[in-house]
Swiss-Prot record:
InterPro entries listed in its UniProt record: NA-bd_OB-fold (IPR012340), Ribosomal_uS17 (IPR000266), Ribosomal_uS17_arc/euk (IPR028333), Ribosomal_uS17_archaeal (IPR019978), Ribosomal_uS17_CS (IPR019979)
Keyword Endoplasmic reticulum: no
Protein name per the record: Small ribosomal subunit protein uS17
GO biological process: translation
Transmembrane feature ranges: none
A GO term from the CC aspect: cytosolic small ribosomal subunit
Alphabetized Gene3D superfamilies for the sequence: 2.40.50.1000
CDD domains linked to this entry: Ribosomal_uS17 (cd00364)
Organism: Methanosphaerula palustris (strain ATCC BAA-1556 / DSM 19958 / E1-9c)
PANTHER family named in the record: 40S RIBOSOMAL PROTEIN S11 FAMILY MEMBER, 40S RIBOSOMAL PROTEIN S11-RELATED
UniProt function note: One of the primary rRNA binding proteins, it binds specifically to the 5'-end of 16S ribosomal RNA.
Lineage: Archaea, Methanobacteriati, Methanobacteriota, Stenosarchaea group, Methanomicrobia
Keywords from the UniProt entry: Ribonucleoprotein, Ribosomal protein, RNA-binding, rRNA-binding
Highest taxon listed in the record's lineage: Archaea
Amino acid sequence: MARNIGLNVQPPVEECQDVNCPFHGNLSVRGQVITGKVVSDRMLGTIVVGRDYLHYVRKYKRYEKRSSKLHAHNPPCLQVKVGDIVKIAECRPISKSTTFVVVEVQKP
């Protein structure tokens, strides 16, 4: 039985025993919710999410394209592959560089 995490997302069908799962563990989510594309899934339990955004340059009164990569924890109950569009939510720091967790997978 998945618990309500306070976001408008569908809980996963599978269950897991991960302590850092927002649905089946003790991890609470708060703060930003970001959508991005999975760039890498080679780390154990962690994925890299890339996102593109526009940044305004005042001098030229134009926008420039920028990109960033974020590390996110990947719970075992969500099957995430490279190329998937995922929704990640901010949480407490899980490791040195991981402060987000995957909450929803939207297939490409």
